[in-house]
């Protein structure tokens, strides 16, 4: 006579059969759930031109983004920053500073003032080697915004004359965002620091949008955040 409580197999034998089966079922269930709940990380690669050079931004995120909107918004921010730091554009804050031939106090853009203060500190730390007032010499050699293409090397007299217009001590920081050129023809060339500042501003923008894994490159200058695509950091190639 058979009852629900009788069994022809010993309990240990049944456990050997059912435990692996149940474990496999649970594993499959969890795996399927994880695959649904964890979207694939997507790479967005944006490119453009600014500051007389090219830029590339790589974004890694699990969220779906409108690539056209990202391109547009980043491009607009770069345009805003270029209108501050470019020494080539006549409508930029830096260009207007450079061609204000005066020794009277005048106000400058807060971002320009930040770079001036940083440049003064760097100038002291490097014993004068870092000097953005080198702009007249850069122009003399044909690498500035003056549009001169040189076919000959500048003379010693020309170089020495240009050097008389340089020196961070010839730019005085006053109060309330005011500065004064002790030499009216003094000019600034922030090629060594403006791109880095702009990259920092773009990174702040990306972080504010919620991105945590990205690489920003402008004209060869790079900043990266996060662990890259494989979780081991961003791989940078040098040419």
Task: Spell out what each predicted region is.
Residues 12-239:
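Mature catalytic core of soluble alpha/beta enzymes
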Residues 2-5:
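Tryptophan (W) side chains
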């Amino acid at each position: 006579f058979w009852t629900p409580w009788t069994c022809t197999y010993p309990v240990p034998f049944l456990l050997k059969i059912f435990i692996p089966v149940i474990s496999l079922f649970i594993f499959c269930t969890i795996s399927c759930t994880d695959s649904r709940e964890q979207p694939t990380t997507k790479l967005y690669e944006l490119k453009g031109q600014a500051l007389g050079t090219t830029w590339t931004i790589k974004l890694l995120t699990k969220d779906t983004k409108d690539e056209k909107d990202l391109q547009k918004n980043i491009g607009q921010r770069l345009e805003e920053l270029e209108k501050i730091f470019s020494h080539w554009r006549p409508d930029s804050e830096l260009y207007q500073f450079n061609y204000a031939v005066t020794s009277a106090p005048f106000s400058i853009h807060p971002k320009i003032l930040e770079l001036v203060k940083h440049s003064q500190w760097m100038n002291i730390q490097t014993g004068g080697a870092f000097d953005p007032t080198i702009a007249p010499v850069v122009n003399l050699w044909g690498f500035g915004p003056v549009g001169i293409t040189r076919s000959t090397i500048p003379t010693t007299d020309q170089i020495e004359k240009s050097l008389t217009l340089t020196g961070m001590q010839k730019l005085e920081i006053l109060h309330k965002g005011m500065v004064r050129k002790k030499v009216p023809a003094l000019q600034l060339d922030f090629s060594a620091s403006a791109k880095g500042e702009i990259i920092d501003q773009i990174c702040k923008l990306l972080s504010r949008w919620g991105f945590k894994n990205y690489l920003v490159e402008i004209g060869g200058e790079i900043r990266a955040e996060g662990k890259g695509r494989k979780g081991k950091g961003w791989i940078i190639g040098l040419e």
